[in-house]
């Protein structure tokens, strides 16, 4: 199943107030390159839509919240984003994350997070995407993507550890979430992310825009 929809006169699908809209976007600025995906609920969806969406979100949050030994390979991290789906007998065939360049390519190595072995160590100052997804052929697909920065965490007798810090500041649609499927920790990670999004962006917005953002970043 193709992962990227390219509209043509033969394949154009008009948007309707139902189902999901998956938008994978990005741009290059003088400050750097962005890569982001959001899946947005446009109207009524099925229980399957909501379950798949929540599984993808669980994987996304688990990877974003990960702390790991400095120098771990992306292959070692990949299963973190897939484990909730595997328990449901689901999987995705694309990579979980890729390096992001500045002024060059949005897909830029050598580091990657994927099932196939990639031995490049993950170290401080690397940028990488966090983009698990699930695609049901001829039905619908879901992906949620942020760009992350590897930053120092702690140093112990076992060595140096690093963690991820989100660079992407954009609300994640909470409408389709089956909240009971999220652990307390996953809810905390999502709420903390949304609080950061609001605190960073709200000073840049007018009153109407701030109110929209406040609603979109409310805790669940």
Where are these regions (language model features)?
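Active-site neighborhoods and metal-handling regions in enzymes and metal-associated proteins
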Residues: 1-220
């Amino acid at each position: 199943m193709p992962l990227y929809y390219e509209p043509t006169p033969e394949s154009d699908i008009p948007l309707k107030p139902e189902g999901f809209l998956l938008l994978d976007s990005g741009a290059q600025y003088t400050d750097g390159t962005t890569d982001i995906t959001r899946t947005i609920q446009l109207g009524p969806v099925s229980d399957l839509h909501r379950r798949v969406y929540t599984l993808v979100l669980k994987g996304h949050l688990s990877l974003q919240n990960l702390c790991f030994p400095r120098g771990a390979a992306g292959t070692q991290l990949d299963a973190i984003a897939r484990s909730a789906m595997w328990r449901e007998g689901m999987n995705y065939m694309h990579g979980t994350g890729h390096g992001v360049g500045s002024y060059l390519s949005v897909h830029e190595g050598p580091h990657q997070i994927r099932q196939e072995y990639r031995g490049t160590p993950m170290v401080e100052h690397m940028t990488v995407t966090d983009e698990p997804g699930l695609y049901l052929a001829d039905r619908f697909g879901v992906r949620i993507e942020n760009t992350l920065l590897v930053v120092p965490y702690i140093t112990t007798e076992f060595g140096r550890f690093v963690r991820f810090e989100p660079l992407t500041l954009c609300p994640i649609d909470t409408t389709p979430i089956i909240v009971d499927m999220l652990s307390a920790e996953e809810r905390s990670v999502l709420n903390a992310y949304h609080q950061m999004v609001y605190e960073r962006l709200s000073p840049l917005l007018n009153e109407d825009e701030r109110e929209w953002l406040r609603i979109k970043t409310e805790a669940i």
